[in-house]
Amino acid sequence: MPSIPRKPAFAARIVLCGLVFAAFMSLSGFVVSALGLKMMALPDGANQQAVAMASLLASPLLPLALAPLAVLLPGTFLARSLWLALFAYVSFGLNTMIEARIFSTMVGPGALAGMSVFYVLPCCALALAVAAAFPARAARPAPLPGRTASGWVWRLLLAWLAFPVCYLFFGWAISSLVIEQYRRGVNGLALPPIGVIVATQLGRSLLYLASVLPLVILWGGPWRALAVRLGWAWWVLVGLYGLITAFWMPANLRLIHTLEIGADSFAYAFLLAWALRAPSKRAAAAAMPHAA
């Protein structure tokens, strides 16, 4: 994780942003119910009060994931809020629900639409709070690498395929430890056909790419810093927060998936940041005589 200032004021801002998120999560639940939309159903026996308390206690993780990105994202307050909200919504809300739709019985027919609406308010509120609490330290975006049109095409293709490749590799690495529980349908889990898994991850990757491109284009720091901060953010938004609160899942499954998602988040982030933000060889060669 990127270095974080050890100051009480920083901690207070993180906690406050987390409380804003938690408050709007509760409000969004009322809104979705009032609209008559379906919500995700927890497995039988799940302690909803324990889940709610864990969600509240874990809420500071979410601004802690976005703040390192926010401080190197130049632009107006509203623009920064918009791009952070889009990134958080796709990573934390939409793509997570798509994954839950195929790997569990909790997101039933109609619930995907309801949950997609549910996450709009809290993600927007979180982004506004983080953008306000953590102003940009970068005045302007770092220049994009100079590449030909064909160079950008294959790098965008690589950025699209990077997520499914990382996902499938690390999923395969831990499959022998978890697959039996999915086959047995433990606590609402399900195991879809491999064709469904691959097609879903290709679609999710397009959503990830669309949501992260504004951050990549506007990034005001070096590409390696982008990679580390994106990896940390995805780990929290996609896995860590949700698995901390998923008390209905077996503890060993939660731990294994936490490590798996952390590994593929950082691997994907480094591949994406390298593909889209690393300096071109031509630019590096041109800079060598000046350095000499």
Give residue spans per PLM region.
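Juxtamembrane/disordered regions of integral membrane proteins
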Residues: P2-A292
